[in-house]
Structures are given as structure tokens and as C-alpha cells.
Amino acid sequence: MALTFVDDLGVHGLLPLTYTHGPQDCRVGILTLSQKWNLLWRRQEASLSVNSRLLPNDALLLAAQLLSQGKGLRQGGQDLVWHGQTDRVEWSNWDGEAEWITHPEDIFLKNGFQIRRDVNWLLEAGGEWALPAWSQRVDPDLHTAVYRPEQVYVHPSAIVRAAVLDASEGPIWIGESAEIMAGSMIKGPVAIGEHSSIKMGAKIYGDSTVGP
């Protein structure tokens, strides 16, 4: 499997975030753009070039899976995904949804929806990503108040003590070795990245990602 992320002139709109790394390393939701594509790309034998600002979605992924060598998809003059050298690609117009990060504020405006989408994709992927819901934990903290426990996903190595986890408006994802200290209040959709620490009495509101 080989995914290649290709910058276009649109990366300048993401400055200063893209001074030191590409747009594909920006985290929107739980995962970075490159993590999303690598998680979802199923054609292990095939390489794919991807616009580094492009967020994946199910329909676009399916269309990309069906592309043959030398074929590509464009929308509004912007290259989306393709196989081969761009000057030799036979392009087709993509009239479905294509979602981008164009300016730094897009990362924050799209974050809540991307948390919800990432949760679904991660659970479908299984393996190390398939975190048990709070309602399935064998050792839940009895001093933690949880609303919609089926929407709260906590890595077994994470520590949650005497907190309020409100997933009534969106999922809460707590990653590996994260710590939620006593008195913390978290209202989903929220992603707490691996090795992150939420200090005592902190309030984290929806559409937020903390760490890693």
C-alpha cells in the first residue's frame, strides 16, 4: 500500500499551520487527514495520490477504490485522487461531496462532525481502535457520572476518576494512557488524545479535540 499526499497552491491558505508540516498532518476530529486515509484505504496492492487538503468520505473512497491505473478524479479544476503522474492521468469529474480544509478555522468548524465520523470509522476498523463503550467496561469508576454510556469510548489504559462525561449530544473518545482527573466535566463530541491529561475541575465543551 502506498498513499502519496500532494500539496497544491491551497496549502498557502492554511499558513502558519503548514510552515512545518503538510496539511495531511493536521488533526481534524480524532485523526489526522493522513491517518484517516491510511485507515480506510483498502487496496493494499495499489498506490494512490491524494490532495493533501482533502478529507475522505465514504462515497469518494469507494470511487477511489474503483479507479484504475492512469485514472483520476477532479472537481472544479482541483485534483482529488489519482493513479499515476498528473500529466498523464485521464481525469473524470467528481460530482459528489468533496470536503477540504482551506483555512485554519476549517479545522475547528469541522471538528465536531469529524469526531463523529472518526468514531464510526475506528469502530468499523476494529483491532486496536475498537475501544469498548463505557457500558461494556468491567471496572467503571463508580464516582463518574456518565450520560449516554454507549457513546463514551475509553481505552483500557486510560484513567477516569470522579468526572462527568456527557455524551448526550455527541460521542466522547478517550485514548490510550489519557487521564481524566477528578472534577473534570466533558460534553461531547470530544476527543481526548493518547497520553493527554485533563486537569482537576476542567470543563471541555463539544466539538473539541485535546492532544495527543
Predicted regions and their residues:
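Terminal amphipathic alpha-helical/low-complexity segments used for targeting or macromolecular assembly
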Residues: 1-149
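Structural signal for interior beta-strand "rungs" in well-ordered beta-sheet cores
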Residues: 137-212
